[in-house]
């Protein structure tokens, strides 16, 4: 319950003052993202700061699709240390650009983290009208060891217009 007395740190004009920054460390500086090339923006997807990654994804929505696809593939191929999460980020950026990349989708289906595989199943359902054989991808997902991946595959199969999807 809330105390009935007024706290001494109350601001008479704006109400309570809440601390929204961590004490003992400086504020993060907002990076200047405008004016960066597409390749530089894609590289910024590796940032540990969630706000920066979110702003980068918003800026990448306005980039030419061909340039975006080339930059994403160059980013994935340049670093041998690309992890599961980076593959997920790459596919999500290409999905927001409405660019179907079946090879990257298949690559995400093989990652260790079940969340990446579940996302790949969801994307396979969304792209079912544009993939060569979406049901083959969903069959892989239905046989996955994790229940969330199997569930996403079933939901994705419901998006398919193919009568074989019911099997």
Predicted feature residues:
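Amphipathic alpha-helical scaffolding segments comprising HEAT/armadillo-like alpha-solenoid repeats
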Residues: 33-42, 65-77, 98-110, 129-143, ...
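Long hydrophobic segments that form regular secondary structure
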Residues: 37-87
């Amino acid at each position: 319950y809330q105390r009935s007395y007024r706290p001494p740190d109350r601001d008479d004009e704006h109400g309570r003052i809440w601390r929204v920054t961590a004490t003992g460390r400086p504020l993060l500086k907002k990076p200047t993202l405008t004016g960066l090339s597409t390749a530089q923006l894609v590289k910024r997807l590796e940032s540990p700061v969630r706000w920066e990654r979110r702003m980068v994804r918003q800026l990448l929505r306005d980039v030419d699709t061909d340039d975006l696809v080339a930059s994403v593939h160059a980013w994935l191929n340049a670093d041998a240390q690309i992890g599961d999460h980076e593959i997920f980020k790459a596919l999500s950026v290409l999905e927001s650009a409405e660019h179907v990349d079946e090879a990257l989708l298949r690559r995400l289906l093989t990652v260790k983290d079940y969340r990446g595989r579940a996302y790949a199943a969801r994307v396979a359902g969304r792209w079912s009208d544009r993939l060569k054989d979406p049901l083959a991808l969903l069959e892989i997902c239905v046989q996955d060891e994790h229940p969330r991946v199997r569930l996403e595959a079933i939901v994705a199969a419901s998006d398919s217009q193919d009568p074989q999807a019911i099997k």
